[in-house]
Amino acid sequence: TPMVLLREPEGRRRLLPILIGTAEATAIHTSLEGLEPPRPLTHDLMAILLGEFGASLARIVITEVRDHTFYAELHLVATDTDGADGDEPDHVISCRPSDAIALAVRVGAPIFAAEDLVDECGQEAAVVSDDDDAEEIIDEFRDFIENVSPEDFAP
């Protein structure tokens, strides 16, 4: 099962692992690699529709986990007539984290996770120094990925 690992940009630098579907993983990977399909895929279409209707994605927020399922929100703002985006979202739409991330990487929107969610489900990232053996670090990470399950992150 594919997994997205979100990392805190500063501070403790915890990881938030989220299991996602293969189609969504492919959509995220395609966008991150800068690959453009000959015709728009679902998340490309969503990005186009936002622009056509004068809205932009201000940010996404991974908000909570319930019964081993993560939830997210799209924070949309209407583009002002002068082209500036407002600070507060005009619309907040609930969605799957994988769809939110796939859309965010397409439009360059920031990705956030609720602090209490990271406190609850986040995993401490290993501290890597120049002295650490890269092979050992990779083996530990592979072991983590191969053995992780949704129950590991449930409250």
Name each model feature, range by range:
Residues 1-155:
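Divalent-cation
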